[in-house]
């Protein structure tokens, strides 16, 4: 299933790229995710002079000291409205997010999903004709559903839980390359 989704996303991105002209496509990565040892990549496409659409993905497969885990994958699409013009200056956005996670922190095992959305504000600085730096902060909602157990190595005693989260849902300091 993951291969099918990845193939579909790559096909869509390739098809969109074939119809775009210069400075209408950006590939980016979020430095804050890298600080948290989470590889990530995003692509942003101009829809008009003031609107862009972005799709970002992140994946954390690592196991840390003492067999601690915070594994997850995340997808976050976003539509942005630019006050000046695309890829320059202030913007506001609306984003959605979906993720799957597996955690063994705090002597509890949690295995679950989240979905939600929010609004964001950001600013994009032009560094050179092809490089930009973008800062963004988003607030919103996430519905989280997961299985939790006290015993990390076993699955006995699992409890189904749900929670609703309101607060920061996006934080980014990204380096972008514009085509």
What spans do the regions from the language model cover?
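Bacterial Sec-dependent N-terminal signal peptides
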Residues: 1-25, 175, 179
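Repeated loop/turn-to-beta-strand initiation elements of outer-membrane beta-barrel proteins
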Residues: 25, 50-53, 87-88, 129-133
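Solvent-exposed loop/turn segments connecting transmembrane beta-strands
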Residues: 26-41, 64-71, 106
């Amino acid at each position: 299933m993951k291969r099918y989704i990845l193939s579909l996303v790559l096909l869509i991105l390739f098809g969109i790229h074939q119809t775009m002209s210069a400075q209408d496509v950006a590939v980016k990565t979020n430095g804050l995710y890298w600080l948290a040892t989470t590889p990530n990549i995003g692509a942003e496409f101009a829809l008009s002079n003031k609107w862009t659409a972005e799709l970002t993905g992140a994946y954390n497969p690592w196991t840390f000291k003492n067999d601690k885990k915070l594994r997850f994958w995340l997808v976050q699409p976003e539509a942005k409205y630019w006050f000046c013009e695309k890829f320059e200056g202030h913007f506001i956005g609306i984003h959605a997010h979906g993720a799957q996670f597996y955690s063994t922190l705090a002597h509890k095992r949690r295995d679950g999903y989240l979905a939600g959305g929010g609004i964001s504000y950001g600013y994009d600085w032009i560094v050179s004709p092809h490089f930009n730096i973008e800062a963004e902060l988003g607030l919103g909602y996430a519905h989280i559903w997961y299985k939790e157990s006290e015993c990390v190595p076993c699955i006995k005693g699992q409890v189904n839980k749900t929670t609703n989260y309101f607060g920061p849902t996006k934080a980014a300091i990204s380096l972008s390359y514009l085509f």
